[in-house]
Regions:
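A residue-level signal for conserved active-site and pocket-lining positions in enzyme catalytic cores
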Residues: 3, 25, 80, 179
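Catalytic core of DAGKc-family lipid kinases
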Residues: 28-108
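Gly/Ser/Thr-rich active-site loops/lids in small-molecule metabolic enzymes
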Residues: 103-107, 111-148
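Gly/Ser-rich helix-loop-strand patches that form or flank binding pockets
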Residues: 9, 14-24
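Short aromatic-centered micro-motifs
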Residues: 95, 117, 175
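ATP/nucleoside-binding phosphotransfer catalytic cores, i.e., glycine-rich phosphate-binding loops
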Residues: 68, 82, 87, 98-101, ...
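Short glycine-rich anion-binding loops that position phosphate/pyrophosphate groups of nucleotides
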Residues: 3-6, 29, 116-118
């Protein structure tokens, strides 16, 4: 019971149990939820009892902040974001794909998103919308100081490594998982991102297509 944020948090908290989940929207948008709390619930309960539903696996991301002394890990259903904490200066960082240098950015940060997360922060930053059942990763710079910096679509087998290039004392940077789990990132450390070994499984009750869901819910914003 709740909004998209509640469902995202539950997906991380319950990942080891691999339980199917269904969201009942009590929040604002409810893009990930199946029904609204205002709807009559008897048909929903009947569908669950009669196995009149499908299960949809949603890819997740695993991120690691790798330092000289320790490594901390987290998982995300929507996205992992490299961002600043308390300054307005741009970040200067490099991105490596599968240990090969890809690009260097001056930007407010960068988003690594799943197909589920393609309609969240990634969309606001100009990234593409992707069907939620797809198996891929999106990498979208945030307000890059370049006319050529664009989102890229990656294989789910790719490994992303993000490294800070320039550091000035007093700056604080963070790796943020799904908007609420925050790990500080310091110069000399790197943020490594790959597909998580487990999935979130969502119960799908209604025969509503992905595009219809986009049309109905995104037009409200």
């Amino acid at each position: 019971l709740g909004g998209d944020g509640t469902l995202i948090q539950a997906s991380r908290d319950l990942i080891s149990l691999e339980l199917p989940m269904m969201g009942i929207n009590m929040g604002h948008l409810g893009y990930l939820t199946q029904v609204s709390g205002e709807e009559f619930m008897d048909p929903v309960l009947d569908a669950l009892l009669n196995d009149s539903f499908t299960l949809e696996k949603r890819m997740m991301l695993e991120g690691s902040v790798v330092g000289a002394q320790k490594t901390v890990k987290g998982i995300a259903l929507n996205e992992i974001v490299l961002t600043r904490q308390d300054v307005l200066q741009m970040l200067h960082f490099q991105v490596y794909l599968n240990d090969t240098f890809f690009n260097e950015y001056m930007a407010d940060g960068i988003i690594a998103a799943t197909p589920t997360g393609s309609t969240a922060y990634n969309l606001s930053a100009g990234g593409p919308i992707v069907a939620p059942g797809a198996q891929l990763m999106l990498l979208t710079p945030i307000c890059s100081h370049s006319i050529s910096a664009r989102s890229i679509v990656l294989s789910p087998e790719d490994r992303i490594s993000i490294r800070l290039v320039k550091w000035s004392g007093g700056k604080s940077y963070s790796a943020v998982f799904d908007g609420d789990q925050v790990f500080p990132l310091h110069y000399g450390e790197k943020l490594e991102i790959c597909r998580a070994p487990k999935y979130t499984t969502l119960i799908q009750l209604k025969n509503v297509s992905f595009l219809e869901n986009i049309r109905q819910k995104m037009n409200r914003i």
